[in-house]
Amino acid sequence: LRASQPVKIMENGDMFVYKETVNKHDYILVADVAKGRGQDYSTFSLIDISTRPFEQVAVYRNNTISPLLFPNIIYKYANVYNKAYCIIESNDQGSVVCNGLYYDLEYENVHVESAIKANAVGIEINRKSKRLGCSALKDLMENNKIKVVDEQTILEISTFEAKGQTFEASTGNHDDLVMNLVLFGYFVSSAYFANLTDINIKDMIFKQKLKAIEEDIVPFGFIDDGSEQIEKLQNEESEDPMRRQWQISYDREL
């Protein structure tokens, strides 16, 4: 992983832009929500899914913003990036942000898990979905399917570790930006993403691994039993007029 320098720093140093919006490109905004009390950070990452590999193009990180105000920041930059599709972690304070963005600000391009169930805006992260997201993110990174350029995100990835049955930041570190990518990994490996974009991540990774295996296989050798050389000599003899005459005379003597 290699960090890049942002082309713009906005929102009083909380918003880092690495690439400007590209016309007709599709973007996904993934957000992790904190309480805004100076401890954990409310974050989001904007990811361009029209490029190969997918590319992180902007990051927001703030540990004092209220969940009541965070939807306004998301709304602002989701619109800037071609009405980005928003995937928000809905646990605890996350539901406040989900509902604020979807209902109060009437931003429709938000992931909704169920059209029937109440409070279904966003994605609820539990132990199972977190494990699946971590596994999917690992596959994306190992197979170069996502380009991470933000320095703080890379730092958090380096201190993200397994603890028991889950994954989290090592003692004294944060994982809020990593959780953006975990949420992204969980979503892009789902059937919903495949239907939404016609991009099947699992199939792409499987084909890449299969190709790598095929390239590593040593080709089977050929056994030279001399048959090719014998056939060549026979052809040469049949084309030699002296050889044909000798054969005829030999047959007559018999």
Regions found by a protein language model. Name each.
Residues E124-I125:
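Phosphate-backbone recognition surface of nucleic-acid-processing proteins
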Residues L1-A115, V121, R131, S135, ...:
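RNase H-like, metal-dependent nuclease domains and their acidic two-metal-ion catalytic environment used
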